[in-house]
Amino acid sequence: MSDKRRYFGTDGVRGKVGQYPITPDFVLKLGWAAGRVLAKQGTKKVIIGKDTRISGYMLESALEAGLAAAGLKATFTGPMPTPAVAYLTQTFRAEAGIVISASHNPYYDNGIKFFSSEGTKLPDDIELAIEAELDKEIECVESAELGKATRLNDAAGRYIEFCKSTFPSELSLAKLKIVVDCANGATYHIAPNVFTELGADVIAMGVTPNGTNINHEVGATDVRALQQRVVEEQADLGLAFDGDGDRIIMVDHLGNKVDGDQIAYIIARDALRRGELKGGVVGTLMTNLGMENGLKQLGIPFVRAAVGDRYVMEKLLEKGWKIGAENSGHVILLDKVTTGDAIVAALQVLASVVGSELSLNELSKGMTLYPQVLENVRFAGQGNPLEAEAVKKAVEEVEADLGSKGRVLLRKSGTEPLIRVMVEGEDGELVQNSALKIAQAVKDNC
């Protein structure tokens, strides 16, 4: 079996709705292929959740038809955060969990990602086995063996109670005023309840999904509205989730953004203070140098993984560590969850705020972020602009200008048709100009 994946990217199968492979016919066959592979493993039961995109209705119907044809039973949760599906997959002893979501992408994109029975991303060999089944003609099981579909009516309540259980029982959020931005996504009916039930005064925004407004000028990918609201309401802090609830970005009382690097730093430092830190912290190639330096000053080990929460998880398991993060807001806390969980990560930071009696602003000052600029260049997928001589020359010139006080990273996105250009260093103006210089060279060679 070839190890070259044709459909599965770093976060499942993803694309524009109506364009291959995110079409009803392909998703039906994907459900059947996955069902064929998973049916060999035991319970023949699958949990299916989705975010709030309008296309979710179409895709879950197609997916369920394929699974049923392979003899698997599907249990629908309705709109549900990605980490909630991972949790429910474990608690229901299901064979797998499936999430219909394109995470932080616009509403016209969608995707399918799978969790194993342990609530983790599917192993490579299972993904490859599913791809191999996709090459075959669909064959239904006998009529008596066809799968059935049911709905789990209390999924939200179960997950809310789980999230609350990760917050120290001796602490309360009673003194905090929090603005919660749910990105008009999957956390809209969950996150406000979690923080309210723990005592916080919650102001909710991004909680009116209509199928097309997910991630639109709200949520973790665009915190401007949250920053403004936190200041206007004189709130203690703000929380921004992405469309499927696996990313968290925070905002302090002054309206300053607190990203995934800073969140992981705060959680690690608090664990160290309590004597509960197990090992070090895993970041990625995009992790700010300021985080690496801040952790080193505390004596906390740090290593970088490739970009993508899948690779952060792999490195955590390899090292036996418990805390991993991406600056985009994926925070993985393996002593509490099996995948990136934005609500659980937020609760750990809030526990630090309450326990230390320090503001989020004060806690985040423990590390100094280097200026970092990220430019995204549209890329149709033809050729490889990263190999162009003009691009290589631009990178060499920028690296010479930055010297030992900065770095450059160019990579293809694993989830979108983009080339990402990241430049980081001590001199903010130089970093900005350098990023634009490289981005222009990439554009000229796309």
Curated annotation (Swiss-Prot):
InterPro entries: A-D-PHexomutase_a/b/a-I, A-D-PHexomutase_a/b/a-I/II/III, A-D-PHexomutase_a/b/a-II, A-D-PHexomutase_a/b/a-III, A-D-PHexomutase_C, A-D-PHexomutase_C_sf, A-D-PHexomutase_CS, Alpha-D-phosphohexomutase_SF
GO cellular component, one term: cytosol
Keyword Magnesium: yes
Binding site for Mg(2+): S103, D242, D244, D246
E.C. no: 5.4.2.10
Pfam families: PGM_PMM_I, PGM_PMM_II, PGM_PMM_III, PGM_PMM_IV
Highest taxon in the source lineage: Bacteria
Reactions catalysed, as given in the entry: alpha-D-glucosamine 1-phosphate = D-glucosamine 6-phosphate
PTM (free text): Activated by phosphorylation.
Cofactor list: Mg(2+)
Cofactor binding, note field: Binds 1 Mg(2+) ion per subunit.
Active site: S103
GO MF annotation list: magnesium ion binding; phosphoglucosamine mutase activity; phosphomannomutase activity
Top EC class of this enzyme: isomerase
Annotated keywords: Isomerase, Magnesium, Metal-binding, Phosphoprotein
Entry keyword annotation includes Cell membrane: no
GO terms, biological process: carbohydrate metabolic process; peptidoglycan biosynthetic process; UDP-N-acetylglucosamine biosynthetic process
Modified residues (Phosphoserine): S103
Family designation: Belongs to the phosphohexose mutase family.
The protein's role, per its UniProt record: Catalyzes the conversion of glucosamine-6-phosphate to glucosamine-1-phosphate.
Protein name stated in the entry: Phosphoglucosamine mutase
Organism (species): Vibrio vulnificus (strain YJ016)
Gene behind the chain: glmM
